[in-house]
Amino acid sequence: MMPSESGDESLEQPAAQVGTGAASAVATAGAAGGGPDLEASSASLGRHQSRLSWPQVKRLDALLKEPIPIHGRGNFPTLSVQPQQIVQVVRSSLEEQGLHVHSVRLHGSAASHVLHPESGLGYKDLDLVFQMDLQSEASFQLTKAVVLACLLDFLPAGVSRAKITPLTLKEAYVQKLVKVCTDLDRWSLISLSNKSGKNVELKFVDSVRRQFEFSIDSFQIILDSLLLFGQCSSTPMSEAFHPTVTGESLYGDFAEALEHLQHRVIATRSPEEIRGGGLLKYCHLLVRGFRPRPSTDVRALQRYMCSRFFIDFPDPVEQRRILERYLEAHFGGAEAARRYACLVTLHRVVNESTVCLMSHERRQTLDLITMLALQALAEQGPAAMAALAWRRPGSDGVVPATVNYYVTPMQPLLPRAHSYPTWLPCN
């Protein structure tokens, strides 16, 4: 879809005129509480959407203006990037190249943090979604070229740009490049490196089957109005004068999903569609104090997730790589003590809910989880290394994050699973 001439002309309006347009989207003073005014929102928005409150808009603005270091490999300097800056530069460059961006959204854990920072989950990656048309291979290549070219704008002053090529920038600053092009999924991802794990992830989406695992990570916040306000208005934001920002839940019901986030509830729709990583996210949520909704068929949910995990990651080497990467991303630094609890929880779920595996394959995965749990236990310090510590999870599946109990060293860390003599039927 090419931008129309009239659309280009509208971008060239005088700042004062555009500022007036931005002001028309300003939310007047509303409730100063942490949650959106759902009653007011329902008048003009669907159930899957809601307007953000003033405190939420402030958190969003602060998040988009917080400088994030993009660490270079080798001798390349560290780039200091504000998320709103890179969004504006990339979007403008895409439009100049004839690729129209329908909207830009904040997705995932960062969006959940903006809506309810007291969930205890925090956020790592900053997921920025550009909704656009990607109908050809050329459009995929052009988005990658645009992002790499934009990185030049963020190099520190004094750095010679003459001999820096796009390939050089990719090797220096890109953590991950992904392209998915199927009948149902057309999107690409460029993840920019950050040593602390807070990667800036630019995702260019034409279509995708599913963008969430549970209701609490289904939120997207549309950034267009806030970005336009920052560009066009010289008046600082206030409770009485700020842009109207809309949030959306891909789960379907915004109010219900927000309530799940506030009360630490695990809920989802069509669990059979959850990808393999959903099993790790589920165990992560259990360790953080989240609990399945009472009406949930927990055994069925766990069976779906276990089955999908082994479909997506059948090889033990790949399983280990995925587990280690997830633990490093979500339980690094001060959170490292929770790795043991997460692995014990994962062992329990896999032990209870895995079907469609030969007994030796199942045992192989359980042994891998046991070994990683032992490593995590040893990393907690000399006291934990002195004995193998084990405590069965309670009825709610909770395992303490730190070890302050001891048992005879001869007792195994994790209970040995019952072996199954032959192939288990898939239900």
UniProtKB/Swiss-Prot annotation:
UniProt feature, compositional bias: Acidic residues: 1-11
GO biological process, one term: negative regulation of apoptotic process
KW Isomerase (keyword) present: no
Catalytic activity, EC: 2.7.7.19
Chain intervals with Low complexity compositional bias: 15-30
GO MF annotations in UniProt: poly(A) RNA polymerase activity
Region of interest: Disordered: 1-46
An annotated GO cellular component: nucleus
Residues spanning the membrane: none
Record field: catalytic activity: RNA(n) + ATP = RNA(n)-3'-adenine ribonucleotide + diphosphate
Subcellular location field: Cytoplasm; Nucleus
Keyword list, A-Z: Cytoplasm, Nucleotidyltransferase, Nucleus, Transferase
Function of the molecule: Catalyzes the transfer of one adenosine molecule from an ATP to an mRNA poly(A) tail bearing a 3'-OH terminal group in an ATP hydrolysis-dependent manner. May be involved in maintaining the translation efficiency of at least some genes through preventing degradation of their mRNAs. Prefers RNA molecules that are adenosine-rich close to 3'-end. In addition, may inhibit cell proliferation and cell cycle progression through ubiquitination of beta-catenin/CTNNB1.
Recorded superkingdom: Eukaryota
InterPro entries associated with the record: TET5
Source organism (scientific name): Rattus norvegicus
Protein's UniProt name: Terminal nucleotidyltransferase 5B
